[in-house]
């Protein structure tokens, strides 16, 4: 018996043909990204036939989680939804409602706290939930809290890096994550400034496990994929600037680990595999991009355990309920454009 009737895997979304690219970019930009930047990104998609890898990888993630849950004796419907491409949030929620679903647990494949990576999904999930005849949401929808502290995420990263370091033992390790506006980073999490520390805590745990294996590469954190107005401060340094600096310091081999992404996005296959790799080549540096954790079995098993704990916990109860954990509060990760926009609640699945 579970406290939820379905699991929704809600992602950013991406186009799956060139015909979908213009509408997708307009939805993403919302009029806040300069036209020249949009044209540049459209060119990136054209290089890949207009197809982002992210939707297929999120479908694979959902399928792998479904198998892992069934192996644990839990068989609930699992659906996919996206913020910026089909199936949209409201479509997926309406479909679940039509199937008699009433309580939905949502997993967003972004483990860190920020407006763009957490609250924006909570806002859109509420906006996409139909209202019944009595003026109440027809579905009870909650979103699993950020899970950057999931031990399986550390183990998966160590597994990937151990293999890369075996081939490149003298490489300098650069962890990357999505740059966000500095103001967004400063207001991330219930008490602010959670975004960067969550990454650093994950890196510290990864490096400790690598050290236990006798691997002690030098490392740093860099950012990638900034967009928006150039007048708005975003997190730095950029991965390409880091590579250029490292070349000047005599570094000849770089391993890039995109810990900010659980699956491949266009930001991974273009910004890293294409642009960052080209920057390294310009400086005659070896460049290795570590895979995203995706459906790596050790990660799926750990994530499935977290979801089982959530599916088995009644919302609002238990020693680690949202109110007790003080995470994903109504005011955290605020919307800088629409103050106070309502959201669905976050949901804590128990101590990890």
UniProtKB/Swiss-Prot annotation:
Q: What reaction is this protein's catalytic activity? A: Fe-coproporphyrin III + 2 H(+) = coproporphyrin III + Fe(2+)
Coiled coil stretches, renumbered = none
Give the gene symbol. cpfC
Under CDD domains, the record lists:
Ferrochelatase_C, Ferrochelatase_N
One GO cellular component term of this record is: cytoplasm
Cellular compartment(s): Cytoplasm
One GO BP: heme biosynthetic process
Quote the SUPFAM superfamilies the UniProt record gives. Chelatase
Q: Which residues does Fe(2+) bind?
A: 178, 267
What does this gene product do? Involved in coproporphyrin-dependent heme b biosynthesis. Catalyzes the insertion of ferrous iron into coproporphyrin III to form Fe-coproporphyrin III.
Q: E.C. number, please?
A: 4.99.1.9
- Identify the keywords attached in UniProt to this record, alphabetized: Cytoplasm, Heme biosynthesis, Iron, Lyase, Metal-binding, Porphyrin biosynthesis
User: Matching InterPro entries, A to Z?
Assistant: Ferrochelatase (IPR001015), Ferrochelatase_AS (IPR019772), Ferrochelatase_C (IPR033644), Ferrochelatase_N (IPR033659)
Cite the GO molecular-function annotations of the record: ferrochelatase activity; metal ion binding
What pathway annotation does it carry?
A: Porphyrin-containing compound metabolism; protoheme biosynthesis
The protein's matches in HAMAP family, at most eight in alphabetical order, are given as:
Ferrochelatase
- The protein in question is named Coproporphyrin III ferrochelatase
Q: What is its main location?
A: cytoplasm
Question: Which species is listed as the source?
Answer: Propionibacterium freudenreichii subsp. freudenreichii
Provide the family line: Belongs to the ferrochelatase family.
Residues binding Fe-coproporphyrin III are: 52, 121
